[in-house]
Amino acid sequence: MTRKKWSFLFTVCLVTALIGCGQKNSQVDKNNSEELNKLGQIQVISREEGSGTRDTFASLAGFNKDGADGIDKTVNTATIADSMDSVIETVNKNPSAIGYVSAGTIGIDGVKTLEINGEAVSDNKGKYPLTRSFYLAYSGTLNDVEQDFMTYVQSVGQEIVSGHYETIAKNATFLSNQSEGTIRIEGSTSMAALMKEIADAYMKINTHATIQVTATDSTKGLNSVMSGNCEMAMSSRDLKDYEKELLNYNTVAKDKIAVIVNQKNPLSDITLYMLKSI
């Protein structure tokens, strides 16, 4: 499949009148059309299959093939990145690139976020369309140290969550039971940095516990906890029906998926319709 050009995208924006692309008048439109034409072909940067961010992005943007559990319609010319950092690095270096990452990672020079349907990723009114939950999933019943950690995550740990994401509960007091044990947590790269920060803070309170956080992807993490190779899985997507039957899970944070482009790209706004088009 031939990659579309940025100038084509802008032309469609104007013709359909579905999006203003962040522009204020016809002169700006003309200038942006010229700048977009210089960018050439659009290079889509996508996460790998199994990524919770990819799964959720495809679902929310409306290009799953066969419903919520279907294969998504990510363009076959997309460059595949195996982590958020890789997406950001690629977009940073390529003026014609567009990608998507957890909004909690934004702030790196060289990339900018696009408004979606006129709503900024910083919107706190609940109107931003690419919003999801972060989950910790586990099999069976939590043991003492696992329950202690989960309680921490959903209480005092929410203060750490609030630094980058939307909390799921008000901060509450926490008194550790000082249980001993090791908790292996695997899964989403979008969640890994947050969970490492929470785990480090918890281990200062409960010095008898050891928590190991390994970033793979949501699907690998869920498969790992189902097979008994770890105690908890980080999932940045909703669990599928069969996973819900086999696992228990708790919400630990709310996140937004940001669509990012290079700073040289003149666009500031895009719609879900246009995302599907590219």
Give short role names for the model-derived ranges:
Residues 2-25:
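Sec-dependent N-terminal signal peptides of Gram-positive bacterial secreted proteins and lipoproteins
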